[in-house]
Amino acid sequence: MMEKIRKGDEIVVITGKDKGKRGTVLRRVDDEHVLVEGVNRAKKHVKPNPVKGVAGGIVDKDMPIHISNVALFNPATKKADRVGFKALDDGRKVRVFKSNGELVNA
């Protein structure tokens, strides 16, 4: 199945506490959530683990964000944009921006 938002895409948060922030998708957590670099950060308390060499303390961590709260960044318009799909003549299915019809770079 074709995904509208993939790993490596540059996105804009369109709603929530981080509205307007831009970041890169690190991975898809599941069908409905993505992990975005520098967005939706939370403080997590980590226990020290001398065996693994981990020092304890409070760590900032990226948390998953729902896919409905993000939109793909369109470099041509410099704004967040919706994504659609288009079948090419050679049979490939590609992602396109809804506003201007340009192909999304893979």
UniProtKB/Swiss-Prot annotation:
Keywords: Ribonucleoprotein, Ribosomal protein, RNA-binding, rRNA-binding. GO terms for biological process: translation. It holds the Pfam family ribosomal_L24. One of its GO terms (molecular function) is rRNA binding. It comes from the Bacteria. GO terms for cellular component: ribonucleoprotein complex; ribosome. InterPro entries: KOW (IPR005824), Rib_uL2_dom2 (IPR014722), Ribosomal_uL24 (IPR003256), Ribosomal_uL24_CS (IPR005825), Ribosomal_uL24_KOW (IPR041988), Translation_prot_SH3-like_sf (IPR008991). Belongs to the universal ribosomal protein uL24 family. One of two assembly initiator proteins, it binds directly to the 5'-end of the 23S rRNA, where it nucleates assembly of the 50S subunit. Part of the 50S ribosomal subunit. This is Large ribosomal subunit protein uL24. The lineage of its organism: Bacteria, Pseudomonadati, Pseudomonadota, Betaproteobacteria, Rhodocyclales.
